[in-house]
């Protein structure tokens, strides 16, 4: 198999984000901020650092804010410069580097992740490509997709980012089956979408990162609706495995499930602790709360238990 340069990243962003209502009623869930950047910007930055230059967003209704975010805003930049806020103006300009191109494709119906990836085919063409699910925020020294691109170039086949999950949670993920000793890179021999714990082939879950060969498109075109009445990417990958090797890669880094409210809050706290300017004051705030033996009380009157002591982490740039 010819190992081409991976120039394209696909971002399926058509989902409605109902778990975050009413916050996502008029704003895309991918625009939810983690400290001072939206989830989709973290996703794009990871793809760019992995070598992507063409960014394909598969969108749906109420997603215009994503397009606006990555568009230039000369008026805002001019205003910031006139107010002496040159650093902020530079941050606005750097949201999307000039070498990157954005393509927006509308998913006509909510038919699942496999269908969303298939919608990107005209923009991807006959090249390998990355798929990034912005819900899964991964904090890593080397960006997760960059790690996976290296595995693709080493092995020459599609690569799925995986991690072990509690056996009781296999019905939330696509689960892979590998054979032999547990290693960082393993050939996949089976994959199933959201199996019940009693029948799951393992607890090794696919978590929002893919490097795929273009052959996946021909298989997605042939499959019907699977679990949940959707066209499942896992079903397409299962067919792809009949003709090409597909690999599971246990990535280095910590994943936050920002598709859940708890995971989103955990990401916000840890990224805030690691922020170059906010980290110190925020850490002191949490320590003061713990010293007082209480956590802040929400407006509903419900109080949470004292926070666990935050662990030191590498500093993140502002």
Enumerate the predicted regions with their spans.
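Catalytic-core segments of class I nucleotidyltransferases/pyrophosphorylases
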Residues: 130, 149-153, 180-284
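Alpha-helix/helix-capping structural signal
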Residues: 15, 61, 136, 143, ...
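Conserved beta-loop-beta/alpha segment of the NTase-like Rossmann-fold superfamily
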Residues: 76-79, 86-178, 212-214, 221-223
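N-terminal glycine-rich phosphate-binding loop and ensuing alpha1 helix
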Residues: 2-82, 143-147
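Residues at the starts of beta-strands that form the adenosine-phosphate
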Residues: 8, 53-55, 101, 128, ...
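Hydrophobic helical membrane-anchoring modules
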Residues: 262-318
